[in-house]
């Protein structure tokens, strides 16, 4: 008894190869974090972001929040970094977001350069670097704000641009300039868990 040998036509082999290549191309075009947009629209997550690169530490003596020239501000690298972060977020599927920022100019400028929507100054995101005794009250205020914002905008991505001390107090995580922390929270706004997304660099 002879075994039958089936020969796949060359045109069919070529078609299969094309389909495989197309599948690989589509897979390669997917965002680096396919679930980021989904998480940010489930009413349980917020994206905390440390402001982009601003040379120096702290602020000059006598600085004023309503005068950017008296503060430590973004450098050219920080401005480029902010734009890259915005592009990265767009690549994850975010076309717009509710964006809130600390009153410090380096935070507000970072937020605006994301180009994902209007920026609203939110006091609970303000730094307490100058007075660490405010850490607990400021973090409690942030939790209250997060809870209220998620209730008001449950289906919109919520981006909060702030400072390293605020992010560490809220999540327990130390982050570099421009880094993002996707935080899952309880209904009262308190932290449950988080995932860090390192900032793209110029």
Which residues fall in each region the model found?
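N-terminal secretory signal peptides that target proteins for export/translocation
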Residues: 1-12
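Bacterial N-terminal signal peptides
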Residues: 15-27
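Boundary at the C-terminal end of the N-terminal hydrophobic targeting segment
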Residues: 29-34
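Active-site-proximal alpha-helix that buttresses catalytic centers in soluble enzyme cores
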Residues: 35-123, 128-131, 137, 173-200
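Generic beta-sheet signal
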Residues: 44-46, 154-162
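Glycine-rich phosphate-binding loop signature in dinucleotide/nucleotide-binding domains
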Residues: 92-94, 149-155
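A short, acidic, amphipathic alpha-helical segment used as a generic capping/interface helix at domain edges
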Residues: 141-151
């Amino acid at each position: 008894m002879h075994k039958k040998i089936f020969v796949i036509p060359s045109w069919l082999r070529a078609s299969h190869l094309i389909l495989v290549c197309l599948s690989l191309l589509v897979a390669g075009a997917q965002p680096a974090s396919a679930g980021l947009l989904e998480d940010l629209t489930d009413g349980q997550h917020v994206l905390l972001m440390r402001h982009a690169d601003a040379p120096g530490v702290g602020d000059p003596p006598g600085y004023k929040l309503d005068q950017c020239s008296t503060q430590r501000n973004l450098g050219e690298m920080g401005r480029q970094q902010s734009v890259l972060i915005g592009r990265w977020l767009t690549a994850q599927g975010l076309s717009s977001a509710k964006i809130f920022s600390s009153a410090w100019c380096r935070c507000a400028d970072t937020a605006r350069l994301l180009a994902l929507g209007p920026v609203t100054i939110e006091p609970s995101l303000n730094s307490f670097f100058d007075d660490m005794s405010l850490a607990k009250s400021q973090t409690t205020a942030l939790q209250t704000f997060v809870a209220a914002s998620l209730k008001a905008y449950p289906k919109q991505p919520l981006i909060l641009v702030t400072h390293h001390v605020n992010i560490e107090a809220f999540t327990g995580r130390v982050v570099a300039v421009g880094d993002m922390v996707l935080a899952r929270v309880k209904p009262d706004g308190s932290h449950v868990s988080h995932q860090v997304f390192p900032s793209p660099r110029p």
